[in-house]
From Swiss-Prot:
Zn(2+) binds at E184, H247, H264. It comes from Serratia proteamaculans (strain 568). Keywords: Amino-acid biosynthesis, Aromatic amino acid biosynthesis, Cobalt, Cytoplasm, Lyase, Metal-binding, NAD, Nucleotide-binding, Zinc. Pfam families: DHQ_synthase, DHQS_C. Its EC number is 4.2.3.4. Catalyzes the conversion of 3-deoxy-D-arabino-heptulosonate 7-phosphate (DAHP) to dehydroquinate (DHQ). The keyword rRNA-binding does not apply. GO terms for biological process: amino acid biosynthetic process; aromatic amino acid family biosynthetic process; chorismate biosynthetic process. It is found in: Cytoplasm. This is 3-dehydroquinate synthase.
Amino acid sequence: MERITVTLGERSYPITIAAGLFNDPASFMPLKAGEQVMLVTNQTLAPLYLDHVRKVLEQAGVMVDQVILPDGEQYKSLAVLEQVFSALLEKPHGRDTTLIALGGGVIGDLTGFAAACYQRGVRFIQVPTTLLSQVDSSVGGKTAVNHPLGKNMIGAFYQPVSVVVDLDCLKTLPARELSSGLAEVIKYGIILDHDFFVWLENNIDALVALDMQALAYCIRRCCELKAEVVAADERESGLRALLNLGHTYGHAIEAEMGYGVWLHGEAIAAGMVMAAETAHRLGQFSREDIERIKALLLRAGLPVCGPQEMAPGTYLPHMMRDKKVLAGELRLVLPTAIGQAEVRGGVGHDMVLASIAACFPDGMSK
C-alpha cells in the first residue's frame, strides 16, 4: 500500500493506492459508524462496484444512499448535477453527510462540485476508477461541470477529504479509456520530470498491457507530482497552470466535436503535440523532442493529430474562452524541454493557427 499526502494545512488529505481497497471499510476514512453517505456513480460502473462498496460500508455501520447517473462526458452538466441535489434533498441529507464519487473524471468532477455547493459545502471522498482520474482529476480539488460553450466553465476549487485508488478497477477499464489516461501520465513527464518521461519510454508497453507493478509505480509517481504542485499552488496562480499542457487546444476539440466524441485524454494528446509544435516555432523546443512525444503517444494508442473535420480557425473561438486568458490575451502552456514547461502569453494567432494546421493528418511537419 502506498500513501501520499496532499499538504494543505488543515485541509490536507491522503491518497491511498493499493489493490483490494474496496474490501476494507477503513479505506474510506474518515467515515465512521452512524454517519450518512450519498454514493454517486454511473450506469456503467454500478453493476461492477456499487453493491460491493455499499455492502462494505453498511457492514461498518455507515448509512448509505445512492444516485446512479448516466455515463459520459456529455452528462457532466448542470441538469445532471441537479439530480444529485434532488437525491440529497429527498432523503434528506444534512451538512454532516459525505458524498462519495465512485467513478472516473466525470463523476469525480460533478460530485465534487455538488459537495462544494450543497448546503454551502459538505465532505466528499474521491474513489477514482479510471486511470485518468486516478493520476489526475481526483487529486487537487478542481470540481466542475461543462457548459455548451466551454469545458469545466462552472465549478469550484474544493478539496476531498481523501482519495481511494483501488488498482483492481483498472482490470475492467476499456482499452480506449486506459489510453486516454495515459495521455495525462505522459503530460507529467513532459512538463515536470524528464526521468519519468524516459521511464515511460521504457515501460509504456507494460502499462498498455496492464502490468500491475508498472501501473502502481506510474500512478504513485503521478500522484506525487500532482500533490507537490497542488501544495505549492492550490488555486492555479502559477505552477499549477503547467498541468494544463495541451488542454487549451484539447478543450477546443472536445467542445467543437461534442463532449464525449473524443475522450478527454485523446483530445489532450493531440493538444500536447500542437503545443509542442507551437513551442518549436517559437524556437524553444526541438523537433527531436516533438518526435519523442509523438512516438510515445502513438505507442500508448493515442492520436497525434487533431480531427480532420476541424479547420484550424474553429479552434480559436474556443481557445479564447480558456480560463488562462487574461485581458483578452491567449496564454499557452508550452514545453521548453522534456521535463520543463512555461506559461507564455503574446503568441500570435497566426502562429497558433499554423501550429494547429501542422498537426492535421495530412499536414504533420516533417
